[in-house]
Amino acid sequence: MVQNKTTGSCPKPTEVAPGGPSWCKTSNGHIKRPMNAFMVWSQIERRKLMSLCPNMHNADISRSLGQRWKLLQDTDKIPYVREAERLRLKHMADYPNYKYRPRRRSRTQESKTRARLPRSTATCQSVPSPCLSQMDTGSSMQWGETCPAWGGDQVGQSVETQIRESSARSPEVPTHTKTVPSSPQSAEEHEGLEGGSLVIPVDKEVPPHSGSHFEFPDHCTPEVMEMISGSGLLESVPDLVFSY
């Protein structure tokens, strides 16, 4: 029913093209392209639809015209195809030097579209992640404490300063291993341990493979043997651990 109404109520395609030498020019002197078959048909139907529905939006009108054009049969499109061909030949005769040049987009429109785009990338780069900064700080402090070469010169100097200060002071036994000597032999052994700043007693309660102590063979340097031989602590050599 839509197709019959469309073909029956439409005027003839020959009534579309106006006469005159400037029939395809605008007021600014711009030469328009010749109309194709759909443009010829839609020009007639648009006027009719706007007269029936004056409050209808232009986008809705164009959408409705496109759907109705697809529903038309090929036999119904033949008159509009012929009219479009006639307009093309007339356009070539009136404007032989015409070349189609599409309009370029103005810079003001491009700047407006760029200003509307969200700036999510800039916000992500400006705000650092707290998790990453915390991981970086923790890893650098750990490497600086365990290995001064990786941690930098300042960390290495601070570690050396702490070692010198601790060696200058009286050596203190850790709280979990500090015991009061109960016999003269243990007192002499305790005094011998105080003589060397790098000698620490072994914590026998910790398993050997716990990772907190290092295992060394039961031998030492001649200098240490001479130091121990005077105090009578040769029997307790295997119980000592030397940290370098």
Swiss-Prot record:
Expressed in which tissues: Expressed at a low level in embryos, and in the adult lung, ovary, skeletal muscle, testis, brain and heart.
Gene Ontology molecular function: DNA-binding transcription activator activity, RNA polymerase II-specific; DNA-binding transcription factor activity; RNA polymerase II cis-regulatory region sequence-specific DNA binding; sequence-specific DNA binding
DNA-binding region as annotated in the record: 31-99
GO CC, alphabetical: nucleus
Entries under PROSITE patterns matching the protein: HMG_BOX_2 (PS50118)
Subcellular location: Nucleus
Biased composition (Polar residues): 120-137, 176-186
One Pfam family matching this protein: HMG_box
Region described as Disordered: spans on this chain: 1-22, 101-137, 152-193
SMART domains for this protein: HMG (SM00398)
General function of this protein: Transcription factor that binds to the sequence 5'-AACAAT-3'. Acts as a transcriptional activator.
Record protein name field: Transcription factor Sox-12
Native organism: Xenopus laevis
